[in-house]
């Protein structure tokens, strides 16, 4: 199910996974799916699009926005297949446009069932990635309704994550 808004279908908790085009995000989705099955939780996938910066080129901006939305939908389909393979259930899919930490915070505030945020950490020497770094340095970004953050190291194997998920 894809939407711009969260839906509350039942009273189970939800694990929020940020879906972006990097291997560590896929590992986070894998782990969240496994944990959801063990915890009787649901998974919600969030893809965040950066708004185009062509203010006076409205046609170009709309074309770019449509292409980005199509790419996000395709990415969410891939992530959804992974989550369903692990949890046995279709995840909820949400696409938002804006600044990543702001959109994450808004979605958490809007959907009281979201209980844990799953992020993948990069294996690059430059650090775990901008989103993980932002939230580690300023957890107040999620202060309106703080929730635990599970950071899945990109260097872990799926077998290691299977053992951890139970």
PLM features: residue spans?
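Glycine-rich, Arg-bearing micro-motifs that act as flexible, cationic patches
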Residues: 116-143, 159-162
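Acidic, proline/glycine-rich short linear motifs
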Residues: 47-73, 159-166
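General small-molecule cofactor/ligand-binding pocket signal
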Residues: 44-46, 92-96, 150-152
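Short beta-strand elements of ligand-binding domains
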Residues: 119-120, 148-154
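Short, well-ordered secondary-structure micro-motifs
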Residues: 28, 55-58, 105-106, 129-130, ...
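Structural beta-alpha unit
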Residues: 1-5, 84-117, 156-159, 163-166
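Small/aliphatic-rich secondary-structure junction motif
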Residues: 6-59, 144-145, 153
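N-terminal membrane-insertion helices
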Residues: 72-80
């Amino acid at each position: 199910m894809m939407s711009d808004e969260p839906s509350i279908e039942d009273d189970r908790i939800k694990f929020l996974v940020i879906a972006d085009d990097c291997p560590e995000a896929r590992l986070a989705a894998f782990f969240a799916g496994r944990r959801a099955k063990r915890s009787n939780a649901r998974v919600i996938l969030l893809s965040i699009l950066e708004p185009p910066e062509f203010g006076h080129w409205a046609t170009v901006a709309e074309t770019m926005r449509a292409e980005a939305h199509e790419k996000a939908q395709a990415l969410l389909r891939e992530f959804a297949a992974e989550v369903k393979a692990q949890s046995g259930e279709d995840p909820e899919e949400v696409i938002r446009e804006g600044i990543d930490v702001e959109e994450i915070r808004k979605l958490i505030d809007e959907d009281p069932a979201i209980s844990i945020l799953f992020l993948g950490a990069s294996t690059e020497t430059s650090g775990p990635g901008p989103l993980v770094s932002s939230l580690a340095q300023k957890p107040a970004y999620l202060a309106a309704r703080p929730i635990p953050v599970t950071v899945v190291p990109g260097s872990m194997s799926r077998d290691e994550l299977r053992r951890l998920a139970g």
